[in-house]
């Protein structure tokens, strides 16, 4: 920060206002809504975005999520288990779409600290227009969960747009779904017109 201030002070940009901020802490994603929050709080010379900073209390409140992907872009998110093949399959899928169709394609892969057995998230976008959204997907048209235990740990279904599709890999029949699916998941599926499918991919 001090190096930047010193460099600008001795240039034609000496009257440019400079802010000091922290982002990406703990490998947190930086979203368009957080960037807008920075511009909306230019009276503050220091800030933190992406986390609740209870040490310096410099966190900025962010508004509703902002979607910058072109209209007609399909957003997909896949929740997998480290080394279960989900990431590899999605890398192949997005390459096939990019190489063999007239669509633009983009993929990001998010992991926790464990190499094997940890949570993996694959974020895939594809569509007819160029995609310049350099952040992870927070509202998806399609969400797939490849590990049934995740439905009790993560808010996956809530990441879907109204009318989106949720695919769950599980061995449960209707009775099992009634027993294992959390109440808030059932309520969200019903209230937001989510198309829900199951597949037993481990059978």
PLM features: residue spans?
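Peripheral docking tails and interdomain loops at the edges
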Residues: 2-69, 184-187, 198-203
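Active-site cofactor/cluster-binding pocket
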Residues: 1-2, 6-11, 72-82, 86-203
